[in-house]
Amino acid sequence: MFLLYGGLFFLLLSRFVFIQFTGTAEGQELSTKAENKYSREQILQANRGKIIDRNGEVIAEDTLSYKMIAVLSPSATNNSSLQRHVSDSAKTAKILSKYIDMTEQEIQNLLDKNIKAEKYQVEFGKAGRDISNQQMEEIKSNKLPGIIFIEDLKRLYPNGQFASHLIGFALKEEKEDGEAVAVGKMGLEYIYDEELTGSPGKVEFKSDTKGFLLPNAEKMVTEAQDGLDIYLTLDKTIQNFLEDAMNNAQEKYEPERMTAIVANPKTGEILAMSQRPTFEPNTREGLSTNWLNEVTEQTIEPGSTFKIFTLASAIEEGVWAPNATFNSGSYTIYDSTIRDHNVVGWGKISYLEGFQRSSNVSMAYLLNQIGEKTFNEYINLFGFGQKTGIDLPNEATGIIADSGPVERVTTTYGQGTTVTPIQMVQGMTAIANEGKMMQPYIIDKIVNPNTNEVEQNHKKIEKDSPISAETAQHVKEILASTITSEIGTAKKFKLNGYTSAGKTGTAQISKPGGGYYWGRNDFLYSFLGMAPVEDPQLIVYIMVHKPKLELTESGSDTTSDVFNTVMERSLKYLNIEPENLELANPIEMPDVIDGNMLESQSKLEALGLKTVVIGQSDKVEVQYPESSTTTISNSIVFIKGQGDIQLPNFKGWSKRNVMIYKSLSNVPIEIVGEGFVTEQSLTGGSIVTADTPIVVQLATPEEVTNIEAETEELATDLPQD
């Protein structure tokens, strides 16, 4: 027995000596094992980057929430009178099922399974995350032992239904280590997920056996790096104007779909975009199978809004003759007949009237004058059939129908050819921006919130200039006449306090198997417009797909409800001064061609118009605005004859009227600045010729206060020499 105990003692002593000298046991470094046992690491969560509007208003951000945990191990309870672990899984499950998205049985199974496995604690997955403070307090009021909460982050969209298909949403996903991280699932949240995702930090420290920080122990902190903040060109206020108008139209007309865009024509910035149906990003309520951003990813046949670009092509080519006439109603190509929307037409009418009435036949005749090849070149210059380059993925290009003569004609009025809404807006920037077409964009800048450094900064991109500034001005005025003319199709788009210009569209909707639907409620109604006419600040494009119309309603009711509301509210919000149009009386321009110059001048001034005479002959050869078009009292009108040209005093003139004078007189005038004329290089009254260079300086009303701005005529077209 002595030998047995002695042998055991010797073995233990040998083992002790071995461990002491080698520092290992069972092949493991004991110092490392001890280090690991008493080393603790806490993860510091990183905030996902914010999505912010142009004015610093938050669109998407991380906010404080709570994660619920059930402590299961009896070792957590040090005081038997105060339990700190789940002791009654059935009771706990019954109460918790009232607050989280799990059944009573699911909760009890989860608790019992992990109690049996001797787990210290367990989480409740998705159902136990994103707990609000109110929800947490309600659960706490039940005083359930072992149910604790830790702070967590939740993705919040404070504006709710707000450009939802553009912004998208992010959801928590569990990684392999059990940590839940927000991951972008749709929209900008998905597209810029890598930029928005931050890098978590950690705190490392030595602890006692209960996990508490040892006295005088140092903490090693690696700070979390928040994700990058993305600033958009969107304006929260204008976006809300659009959302409200879309909601009202949705409720009133019950269309299958709607899409709308608001843009700055001078920069290409998208200020608002929306579509219906839509969804609530915080709950995903309303999210259907359609995850497409229809502004960029959906193609449509644009209908008569495409006539804007046919008109611009004709004017730029010099073949637009507004007073020339054609027989409306029908146009035959081989064995196909093109008809006007009212089938019978309006007899022999002028091309200007044809455009105001939205005649398809007028477009067919214009194509003959432009030439098919030349027209296709203009379509390409306006950016159709190709991506705009907007900073969003999966952009569609559309298809230009030019397989045969019929298809080429129908393209002139937007049938058969497909485009995207963003292409229409991009093309319209050339009309509103003196011929310069701007690339649309949505991302303003990307900023690192950890360093405040701008990591990406978008600058406006001027693309092709498909037309001249003079042509753009001409188109703009004709578009204005579709609103002010008694025969115009866009009378319902007249704004309170502001002039507007644009074109209506009624497009047939193609069937999946070919052909088109035909019924009162089977059309795509649209409007592409801008305001104010003098210096457009905004472009608005609205499409309404298959609305339910009453017998007293038209397609223009659906689109004008949105356009007028959004445009008027947005212009006021942008501090664009109303034009006080209610004080101006509409006047139909008389025909003074071939009349005596002095008599014509007296006649026009008797109507309340300001007359500018170009040339000193006795006979009027050109007038602007043309006869039968509408202008307003106190507007500047022009009459031209032969002979010497006496330069007027331009002070207070608008840029538009200087451009009209330049076009009529052929005097080489260089226009510098925006707004109204403050200075001119040659004094009024001087005799000038086509070789006399003149510079006029303009300034905006904000830059100069001593100029009385002229009253602008509402709608005419530029003169033809």
Language-model features: where?
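Periplasmic/cell-envelope proteins involved in peptidoglycan metabolism and beta-lactam response
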Residues: 1-282, 373-383, 495, 545, ...
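Extracytoplasmic
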Residues: 44-47, 54, 61-65, 144, ...
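Conserved SxxK-family serine transpeptidase/carboxypeptidase catalytic domain
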Residues: 127-142, 151-165, 169, 448-560, ...
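Beta-lactam-recognizing serine transpeptidase/beta-lactamase-like catalytic domain environment
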Residues: 60, 208-218, 258-303, 312-541
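Ligand-recognition elements built from short beta-strands and adjacent flexible loops
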Residues: 497, 501, 511, 542-721
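Soluble non-cytosolic domains of exported or imported proteins
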Residues: 46, 83-90, 129-133, 182-186, ...
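Acidic/histidine-enriched alpha-helical segments
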Residues: 108-115, 255-267, 328-329, 392-396, ...
